């Protein structure tokens, strides 16, 4: 019975057959079957890392590099990287090989790595990042979208900023991240832009907000669309216009947010007598 239990624990991650072993990198490291090092290729997203693994055994090994592994910069000034695509690496006895790895920065406040920066790799990320990595392992989006999704969890950035030009493509990922974070699916889309300075620091700037604002208007009114901060202070008047009487209508929004600071706001449709609609959003 004891032997059966031990064998069951190893199924799926480790097996031996005709002196060929397939084993997860984590188990191979724990059992000292391999030694491994990770290095940056000089970027913080996409195929930006390389892992070098040496087989220390007399058998051939097939190493599974798991999605969800967190590569930790040995210099705390630089970003950690989350692996989002699993890879298999075959090694003959005593052989050493390198393999490129797809991953994303999961520490937005730190600097982007330079080429050759060494990373530690004997650690899986937290549960939420592992869930996201496993999702990205089998679902593909553009690099900016995937990077934004990682930051939405690792750095608690706004889930609404997970977008693509064809937003129907990004919607499932936005829904997935909202589920992981246990928050409502955002009613709006926040378009942003990243800028990396020569120091390696990365800043993120808001571009615009898109969505639909539901309202009801009992009679013809002159209405104004405004943005209010979390202290109730007007921070932007978008436009004023005549609004026909209508019930349960929708106003299409495409609002510039250039120059707005990060924080919580509401977008409101008002007349000189009352508020017709209000929606909260965050940058």
Regions found by a protein language model. Give the residues of each.
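Bacterial Sec-dependent N-terminal signal peptides
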Residues: 1-20
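Low-complexity, acidic Ser/Thr/Pro/Gly-rich terminal tails and inter-domain linkers that flank the onset
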Residues: 19-42, 184-200
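Contiguous beta-strand segments within globular domains
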Residues: 46-48, 190-219, 252
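Asparagine-centered strand-capping/turn motif at beta-strand->loop junctions
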Residues: 47-59, 63-65, 215
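Short acidic, flexible loop segments centered on an aromatic residue
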Residues: 59-78, 224-231
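Intrinsically disordered, low-complexity Pro/Gly/Ser/Thr-rich segments with frequent PxxP/GP/PP motifs
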Residues: 72-120, 233-252
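Short, aromatic- and glycine-rich surface loops/edge beta-strands on solvent-exposed regions
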Residues: 225, 261-274
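Edge beta-strands of extracellular beta-sandwich domains
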Residues: 275-283
């Amino acid at each position: 019975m004891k032997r059966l239990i031990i064998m069951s624990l190893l199924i799926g991650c480790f097996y031996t057959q005709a002196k060929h072993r397939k084993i997860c990198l984590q188990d191979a490291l724990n059992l000292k079957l391999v030694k491994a090092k990770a290095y940056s290729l000089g970027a913080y997203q996409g195929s930006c890392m390389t892992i070098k693994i040496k087989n220390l055994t007399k058998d051939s090994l097939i190493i599974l590099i798991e999605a969800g592994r967190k590569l930790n910069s040995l210099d705390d000034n630089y970003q950690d990287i989350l692996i989002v695509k699993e890879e298999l690496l075959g090694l003959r006895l005593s052989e050493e090989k390198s393999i490129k790895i797809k991953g994303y920065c999961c520490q937005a406040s730190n600097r982007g790595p330079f080429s050759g920066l060494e990373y530690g790799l004997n650690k899986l990320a937290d549960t939420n990042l592992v869930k996201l990595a496993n999702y990205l392992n089998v679902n593909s989006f553009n690099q900016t979208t995937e990077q934004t999704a990682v930051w939405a969890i690792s750095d608690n950035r706004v889930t609404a900023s997970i977008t693509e030009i064809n937003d129907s493509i990004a919607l499932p990922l936005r829904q997935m991240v909202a589920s992981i974070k246990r928050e409502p699916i955002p009613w709006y889309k926040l378009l942003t832009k990243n800028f990396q300075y020569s120091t390696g620091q990365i800043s993120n700037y808001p571009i615009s907000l898109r969505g639909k604002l539901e309202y009801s208007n009992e009679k013809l009114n002159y209405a104004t669309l405004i943005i209010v901060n979390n202290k109730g202070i007007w921070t932007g008047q978008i436009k004023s216009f005549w609004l026909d009487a209508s019930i349960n209508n929708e106003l299409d929004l495409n609002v510039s947010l250039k120059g707005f600071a990060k924080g919580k706001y509401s977008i409101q449709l008002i007349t000189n007598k009352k508020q017709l609609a209000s929606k909260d959003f965050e940058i």
